[in-house]
Amino acid sequence: MAAHNILLFGDQADAPIPMIRRIVEKSRYSKNLEYFLQSAVDNVQLEVAKLTPAERETVGSFQSVQDLITALTSKSDRHGIAQMVLVFIARIGELILHAESNPTLLSSSTPLLSLGICGGLLPAAAAAVATNVGELVEVASYMAGVNCRVAAMISRRSLQIEDNAGSWAFSVLGKLVMQLPTILDGFHNEQSIPRHRRAYIAISTPTWATVFGPPSVLKKLLETSAALSKSDITILPAFGAVHAGHLAAPEFEELVDESPLLNKSIKSGYKLLSGSKYAPFAGSSLRDLLPQIMLDIFQNSTNPSRLFEVGGSYLQKGKELSLYMLGATSYLVLLRRSLHAQGFDVALKTNAPILQASELRGGSGSVAIIGMSGQFPGASSVDEMWELLMQREELHKKIPSDRFNADDYLDETGRGFNAITTAYGCFLEHPGLFDHKMFNVSPREAMQMDPGQRLVMHAVYEALEDAGVANNGSVATDSKRIGTYIGDGSDDWRELQQPHGVDKYILQGTQRSFTPGRLNHHFKWEGATFCVDSACGSTASAVGLAYRALVNRDCDTAIAGGSNIIATPFWQSALSKGGFLSTTGGCKTFRGDADGYCRGEAIGVIVLKRLEDALYDNDNIISVIRSYARNHSADTVSITRPHVPAQERVYRRVLQKAGLEPNDISYVEMHGTGTTAGDSAELESVVNILAQKGERETPLVVGAIKANLGHSEAASGISSIMKAAIMFRKGVIPPQVGIPQKLGNFECLERGSVLIPGNPIPYTRQSIGKKRTMIVNNFDAAGGNSCFVLEEPPVPQIKAPDPRPYHVVTVSAHCPQSLERNEQLLRQFLLDNADISLADLAYTTTARRMHHSMRSAYSGNSIKAIVDGINRVLSKKKEAPTARKPPVVFAFTGQGAHYAGMGADLFRSSQAFRATITSLQRICESHGFPPFVQLISKSESPVEKATTVQIHLALIALEIALADLWKTWGIAPDLVIGHSIGEYAALYAAGVLSATDAMYIVGRRATLIQENCKEGTHGMLSISGTSDDVAAILSDERIMSSCEVACRNSPGMIVLSGEHEELLQIEGLLKDQQIKCRLLDVPYAMHSHQMDGIVEGLREAAQGVLFGTPRVKVISTLLGVEHTKFDSDYLVRHTRQAVNFEQAISHCTSHGLVDKTSLWLEIGPNPVSLGLIRSNTNVTSDRALHSLKNGDDNWKSISATLASFYKAGMSIQWREYHRDFANNLSLITLPKYAFDTRDFWMKYTEGQRHSEVQPISTCLHRLVKQEDTAKEQHATFTAEIGHPSLLKIIKGHKLSGITVCPAGVFSEMSLTAARYLLTNGSSKASFPSLSVLDTQIDHPIMPKADSKQTVQVEINRSKQSNEFFVSIADQAKPSVINSKCVVRLRDEHAFDLERRQMLEVIQPKIAKLTKAAAGGRANRFQGKLFYRLFANLMDYTGQYEGVQEAIVSSDFTEALATVQLPKAQSSGESWTLSPYWIDALTHLAGFLFNGNPMNSGDYVFIGIHMERMEIVAKDLSTDVTYQCYAFIEQSEGSDIYRGHVYILDGDLIVGFLEGARFRKMPRTTLHRILGKAEPVKNTKQVPHPTTNGSAIANGVNRNPSHNEPSTPPVANGVNGTNGDQSDRKSLYSVLVQQLIEETGMEESELTPSTFFVEIGVDSLMSISILAALKAETGTELNASFLMDYPTLEDAQRELRRLEGKDSVNSNDQSTMVNGKEKTRECNVVLMQGPSSSTSRKPVFLIADGAGSAAAYIHFPKLGQDLPVYAVESPWVNDPENFVCSFDEAAAMYLAAIRSKQPHGPYILGGWSAGGVFAYEVARLLLEAGERVLGLIIIDITGPRHEDRSKVESPTMEIIDQIGMLSGIERNFDDTTTQSRRLKQHMLSTVTCFSKMDPTPMSPGRHPDCTFVIWAKKDILPKAALDTLPAGLNAWFYPSSHDLGPNGWDALVGNKMEYFQIEGDHFSIMTAPEVTQLGKIIQEAIGKIS
């Protein structure tokens, strides 16, 4: 039957964007179309994922057709994939709309004529088998993927010919069409164009034709053809060759898979015409149709005029035809003209009417759980949690003391303040542990982070590893499509932090929204983030949101879960008072003795994907979420009371969504908290809906995890889901604790069929007789009910083994400790599981892991080989990681290395390698070359029978395929080099030659050799000797007269070419001289005169190919240097002249193209070139890598090389490496990542309650934690520095004018802590006798302005030891130890004996000194004078002053003092040993150093260590006068001195201090250590005491030595300056010190390779650190310094370089403003460039209205060696005081600029308000006679004269309304101090401007040029601008944004230039717009400098 309907599909060259936009708009009204658009994109995504990385990059990441349009418009679609797919989708979209409007259109009974050209045949094929819209959607979705494959194949075939930008086609109109064949033939002959590169006519009609060809050929054709230059030519959007019968046809089987849709039958009335046969395609199914269509697309040319003419014969005459134009097409005119000429009337059908279609089902609606991780009470993992469940463990215990002291709050009546009625809970073991370095968080910030946030980060990482998810590893793991859903219901940590004050990281650490935000930030995910608080339902709600987001396609992978950590008593008290909690212990779920719930802690995270994606991605599916529902108990009598009907409704809803019946549910994981009302209501609702008696074959099993682990509140939902999910894997239902013995009396159980298991029950599909499904309930106290249906995972398919025998196993970590531990864990796992699949192990550790900088890798063919490799690595020291990608060199092998089957293993098992080889074979066949594949693919191939052409082609094809393979795996070269013929493959790898051209030239070259050279007459002789041997040979005329050098391989290796007989004689001659040589088994003498006969033929062949510009460096082995211009002459010389490999390698090393880190990869069949490379360089074996090796399996070589690349820091594309074998591989579960953790826990303290608790002692206040085990004792104490009694002690002790905590306080804390443990805290127990040993003071403690400073004292003792180890640290920085010592139980008997012996030595010294004083030979000081002399360093209050009188030897080396111990001034003081007494009894030694008036006041002696202190505290009394004898000595040859003090009570030594070490240092160094700005100069002279004897000797002599550290430990562990050197510390040491201060890191953790970002240094911290460095050293660094030099090693190198120059000191001079001395200065921040430049004038940018230099931190580099300064407001830190006039403020900016550059010429500028200040500064400079080269004003209108009376007074609300605060709000949370400060400064600036009256510049005094830069977009919409307050906005927003002068011309004159930039006022200052802004400023500076 003839047709009267025509479908016109056009071709793929039509513009798709208008078509796509139309159907996207229409899809809002068509569910069929909406579903098709998503389904088509899904299929294309899957196909794109199969492309090579380079091909994928051209399409980019996409989730919709709109995203594909972006690829098209951004011009990244260089392969035409997006173009072809979009046109297809648009045409099918139009057909869907027409078919919805006319349902009979697709009916099998409707005759249809279908016409399409080229790619238009593909949508026509889909229509051929679709009988309705539903079928069309299904088939077309599949065909969208086929389109993608076709586009990729077109591109691949074309790129093998030419990889060059440009179009592959143009059209010609007019009479010239008939002459085209003649024109093309003439052009080809004239240009010697080889056949494969020729232009050809693909589509022709009588009036126009389309010519296709390589872009460079078409360009040359159009340039050289006079006829074409005069014709109407249109360049077409063609991305490759189609209709190209002269090219090798692709394997069409690769384009069509085994989809069942291919079996669909072609409709009987459907006629699809072939454009080459001009008849309907034959066949009965889509499978038959597609290969014919492919042939028409790829090979056959077509004539549309003839096609349309023939089409008319299939149409019904005499009836109006309906012509459906399915998307725009240029063929419409031609078709209509043809039809009209044949006498048809045509009705054109274009825009189909819209009908609302019925909704289609969108996918399965199921979501897979593919990974999980968690921590639970008593369990650090999910597996450990499961074991607890199986063992019936019930884990409640008393609240640990490290949370809070439960006894302080326990009150069973519940009436007390914050009282708790129960002290029980279920707790995690170590909630404070966190690997801060792993997540780039400084210790300081980590302490502020909620422990739930920290542990969730750990859990997410573990869950991702469990799931095998790495960013961008698959379509579903696109980082832009991963969302995070976290449930959190607690603010405990924020409440805990409040008494300690607000730190700058408290916001992001404790505000709950930062948990998902931090996860996305760290893992670089762009999906949505949600933090959910629905009380106990928080994590269930989070999982529910994640489920819905996946089903709704809002994301493709979701992370869901949350945490519950108990840190304060507040909620314990609230829940106690509310009657929720059990007073007797754990949750007694379903039990008769249930009395409330027991609070619990938990962390849980799951990873989710849509089920279809999980299956496609080869994931391990733990469970499937079939449906989810949530409702609210609206009708309950109380908000917290459960409601049975509401629960029943949520069950019905979730079953309906899942399509299940109640009997399908075999298990319910109940909410089951153990509250009577809750359990009863839940059981009743479950029985009513799911478990009525008589309606079930088997009882419904129920259980609840809370009976074991407590109610983890916000985390309870995720805990229940994880337990339920793992039951599918384990195949067991665990027993319920306390059942059946204590089962409660629930009435509903009598009428229900319910089983609560008391023992484990098998839970398999077989055990229950059907597929397992279960329900998980989660209810919350606020009335919400959540319910999930979980289903068992699909049964895994049995997989064939991986054909690769060798594999790579990798291990990586963020730090060395974690790496070693990960290796140990993996080794143990492999020893325990030796039977696992090596392939699965390799796949899991490579393709399914996130990889870090610290790496190890192992290759092998067995698990044992991997274990042996790990053992070898663990037995030796680790090497530092490679922080940066090393340079990669591809070295291509030359001839002679081939062998049969050289790529056989790869050819057999790697589809990608095989496809490249077969494709190259087809190309060669099209040129008439013989087949060569068997030389690569078959080991048994008779290689000796192969021709030279076959061997050369096989070698180059192998190398091209290997190069492509390595690139696909992520290994791309930075440099290529090829030996001899290998250079052709190198030129391909560099982009100089296309694959087709390379194969063509190599084939023609070999053919010419065969045709023109005689085999066997000539040969090649390889010679190996010393360099002297080679030199002698080359100078020997007997040798060189008959041959020539073919290859110079190394100083001792050459190859000679010549006639065979001559070479035999030379061989004999050399062997007689004991020189190694051998004749090579080659038939010709390459690179010799034998090649003369092929020169012209080769030149002619090469002239027809395109030589591109190298994309990577090419080292020519012809020229021996890097070369960039290649042509036919080069290839001729390359064939004829010698290979200069030696010089080429030498050039690489001498010109820095390679270094010791470079990786050399040989691309070829054997590692021949590597030997030559190593003989020319010192390349180590681990850097010389090969692809293949004769005798080794291909995969052995490749896996070993990949392992080396991985260890060297290369980013391997592991998914690509395993792609061909995905169906053979499975993800396996491996040991968890070994985090390198530190404890960041802080015990809760409550200010008011602390004052009520009696401190342990005056110096040691509270016990935080105590742990006693059989082997050891450990305790943690704290002391509040701000406590009045302790603060009084500290304030009485000043060091050089600065209050510093005395060492005696540290000793007292240590003694008290030890005493507490020994006496169990009893104040009545007798004092133990204790010694203090090895006291070290590393960091001073200085009280801060606030009173929240807390010291933490840690004490440990082994039960077998009598020694306690004590460390003292500021609790805010627990990693920085201030002091440490050992406290030892004293052996009284030994001590008595020792002090008697001591007395015998000391008494004669005392007597001698006393006699000297009596004879006037020693100094006698009374107490007051003693302390006046000591005031040189120490300033004591009276409580410390115990010395009554002192006798000091004349040389100040020994002294004797009488000491009266100070009496206590407060009855509340309590001690073990008073710090006042310790100091009074021992500071005599310090006096001998620092009280000596003859010592220079520039130096001081500081105590740093005390070896031993023995004081019998119980014997001391304030009523006794003691004698103290002291002497000092110098350590030999050092700045270290030692002091000793002995304390006597009559004839009894009651104590002594031995080995007190002091370091001599400059006083200025001490001031820097203590943070003192200026040293205190003593203006009062202390009178020299007169004596009857000789004058006091000179000060102690110093004798430098290198035995001791050069810096005292108090200097924060930073290596500083020696005392005899300059006072100035090194810049690097100050930087490290500031890093430690800001981040809280320990110095030992800072390694040279540490990245600043990894330890939490952000832009704000960076500015703070650099400001401190400037303050201490006077050196000013770029604000971007820590970004420019991102590691410590980088920074150290640059700082050392800078220290070779003069540093720039900040200006100290004052400035006069209005006659008054200015007390403020502007901070001038160096943003870019050197601090001084002799060649370039600096640029000064004045800060905007917010006052901060941070506005300019995103600026790109504005010029080479150009100093760029930002001038900050003087009021940036206290904007409230910014009340001066505009003129006064400008004068301050002027002074700051002149302090840096006293005289001009100047370059000034500023953004926003900074531009106005810059104007005024420029005016003032010009008035002073200075020259201003340029004034740069960024987006601010000229401050024109306005009627100020009209201007409203600025307020915060008004400036917010006009948009001035939006920039701050974009970057800062409004709650931060910084945000408020910046906003206040903005208001102060506007207020200042409101009073200004700008003065125009004087005539003749203008900048050389003024540049004004405008943002094109308004901050606010136009409508909003119209409503702004009158007047004020006029200064900032022009009345009409004309992007011109806008008032500036009235002030600066007419010499102005204007620029404009996309973006608004604020966005232009950040990426990406700031890049363009930087370019404009660079251009402006370039014009004036």
UniProtKB/Swiss-Prot annotation:
Domain PKS/mFAS DH: 1261-1567
Broad class of enzyme this protein falls into: transferase
SMART domains, sorted: PKS_AT, PKS_KS, PKS_PP, PKS_PP_betabranch
Residues covered by region (C-terminal hotdog fold): 1414-1567
UniProt GO BP: fatty acid biosynthetic process; secondary metabolite biosynthetic process; terpenoid biosynthetic process
Residue stretches of biased makeup (Polar residues): 1578-1605
Pathway participation: Secondary metabolite biosynthesis; terpenoid biosynthesis
Domain Ketosynthase family 3 (KS3): 364-792
Enzyme Commission code(s) on record: 2.3.1.-
GO molecular function: fatty acid synthase activity; phosphopantetheine binding
TM helices/strands, residue ranges: none
Region of interest called Disordered, as start-end residue ranges on this chain: 1578-1622
Annotated region (N-terminal acylcarrier protein transacylase (SAT) domain), positions in chain: 7-243
Residue ranges annotated for the Carrier domain, each copy included: 1622-1699
Domain of life: Eukaryota
Annotated keywords: Acyltransferase, Multifunctional enzyme, Phosphopantetheine, Phosphoprotein, Transferase
Keyword Transferase found: yes
Annotated region (Product template (PT) domain), positions in chain: 1265-1566
Disulphide bonds in the chain: none
Keyword Hydrolase recorded: no
PANTHER family for this protein: FATTY ACID SYNTHASE (PTHR43775), SI:DKEY-61P9.11 (PTHR43775:SF37)
The protein's role, per its UniProt record: Non-reducing polyketide synthase; part of the gene cluster that mediates the biosynthesis of the meroterpenoids nectripenoids A and B, as well as cochliquninone D and isocochliquninone E. The pathway probably begins with the HR-PKS ntnH that catalyzes two chain-extension steps to form a reduced triketide, which then primes the SAT domain in the NR-PKS ntnG to initiate three more cycles of extension to give a linear hexaketide corresponding to the polyketide part of nectripenoids.
Domains (record comment): Multidomain protein; including a starter unit:ACP transacylase (SAT) that selects the starter unit; a ketosynthase (KS) that catalyzes repeated decarboxylative condensation to elongate the polyketide backbone; a malonyl-CoA:ACP transacylase (MAT) that selects and transfers the extender unit malonyl-CoA; a product template (PT) domain that controls the immediate cyclization regioselectivity of the reactive polyketide backbone; and an acyl-carrier protein (ACP) that serves as the tether of the growing and completed polyketide via its phosphopantetheinyl arm. The SAT domain at the N-terminus facilitates crosstalk between the two PKSs atnH and atnG encoded by the cluster.
Protein's name according to its UniProt entry: Non-reducing polyketide synthase ntnG
Organism: Nectria sp
